[in-house]
């Protein structure tokens, strides 16, 4: 009994290798700074406004039906001039696929990606940032989902295209906190997986209704069903199960 109990504890402490299932990725994941989250608090598509978080960090959200959203706030130091760091705030959303080998491909909606770039030493006006469209597909070689042994939170370890580790992400909301998954730009038309921007008269005629839908979505942002994850209820079950096993093991050793 004691041996079985120790094996169980060891199994719970090990990483849970991710199967290629979208349900595993469902939720909003954020980096350690805990200040960057996807959703309306990062990007306002009506005003086309990127909202700079307090600290750098990254966040990814995934739905179980194949949609994703990314919010990235990155600051890169300049080794030649420490007063000239390059900062970028990037928003994209679209669809994702998980291959049978566990790799993940993110395909953005071309018309919706936005980036705010600050490169003070390589701009005419160092006090002005550059706001532009941004389209960049992303490939992850694989990922792991496991419970962090220190914080007791679900953790997502993503391996980039070259196999290098991305900073770990922690589950913050489930269901995910996201903007609408359809194309948000009401004036430009493009296939949701196009890498080029095209004009289409039929889409322009629907711009008002689409903008209204987006505004209603933003007005209801505080009515979201996304739940902040401070701890996982399944971990409570594991905890009490472990306590029960420990009690049974102790009783067995005592009676023996």
From Swiss-Prot:
For biological process, the GO terms are:
'de novo' protein folding; budding cell apical bud growth
Q: Where is the composition biased (Acidic residues)?
A: 191-200
State where the protein is found: Endoplasmic reticulum membrane
A molecular function (GO) held by this record is: unfolded protein binding
Lineage top rank: taxon? Eukaryota
Span list, region Disordered: 189-216
Q: Which GO terms describe its cellular component?
A: endoplasmic reticulum membrane
Glycosylation site positions: 81, 101, 127
- Membrane topology term: Single-pass type I membrane protein
Which first-to-last residue range defines the signal peptide? 1-18
Q: Which chain regions cross the lipid bilayer?
A: 235-255
InterPro entries membership? Rot1
PANTHER family named in the record: PROTEIN ROT1 (PTHR28090:SF1)
Describe the function of this protein.
Required for normal levels of the cell wall 1,6-beta-glucan. Involved in a protein folding machinery chaperoning proteins acting in various physiological processes including cell wall synthesis and lysis of autophagic bodies.
Q: Identify this protein by name.
A: Protein ROT1
Q: Which organism is it from?
A: Lodderomyces elongisporus (strain ATCC 11503 / CBS 2605 / JCM 1781 / NBRC 1676 / NRRL YB-4239)
Write the lineage as a comma-separated list.
Answer: Eukaryota, Fungi, Dikarya, Ascomycota, Saccharomycotina
């Amino acid at each position: 009994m004691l041996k079985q109990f120790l094996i169980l504890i060891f199994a719970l402490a090990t990483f849970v290798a991710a199967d290629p299932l979208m349900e595993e990725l469902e939720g909003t994941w954020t980096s350690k700074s805990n200040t960057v989250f996807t959703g309306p608090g990062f990007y306002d598509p009506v005003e086309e406004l990127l909202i700079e978080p307090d600290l750098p960090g990254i966040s990814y959200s995934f739905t179980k039906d194949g949609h994703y959203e990314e919010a990235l706030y990155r600051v890169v130091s300049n080794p030649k001039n420490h007063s000239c760091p390059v900062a970028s705030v990037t928003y994209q959303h679209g669809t994702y696929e998980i291959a049978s080998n566990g790799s993940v491909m993110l395909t953005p909606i071309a018309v919706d990606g936005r980036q705010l770039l600050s490169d003070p030493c390589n701009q005419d006006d160092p006090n002005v940032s550059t706001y532009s469209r941004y389209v960049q597909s992303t490939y992850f070689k694989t990922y792991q989902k496991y419970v962090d042994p220190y914080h007791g939170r679900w953790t997502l370890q993503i391996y980039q295209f070259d196999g290098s580790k991305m900073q770990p992400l922690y589950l913050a909301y489930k269901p995910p906190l996201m903007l609408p998954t359809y194309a948000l730009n009401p004036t430009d038309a493009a296939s949701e997986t196009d890498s080029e921007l095209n004009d289409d008269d039929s889409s322009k005629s629907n711009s008002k209704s689409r903008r209204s839908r987006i505004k209603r979505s933003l007005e209801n942002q505080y009515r979201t069903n996304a739940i902040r994850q401070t701890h996982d209820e399944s971990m409570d079950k594991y905890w009490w199960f472990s306590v029960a096993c420990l009690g049974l093991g102790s009783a067995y050793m005592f009676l023996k």
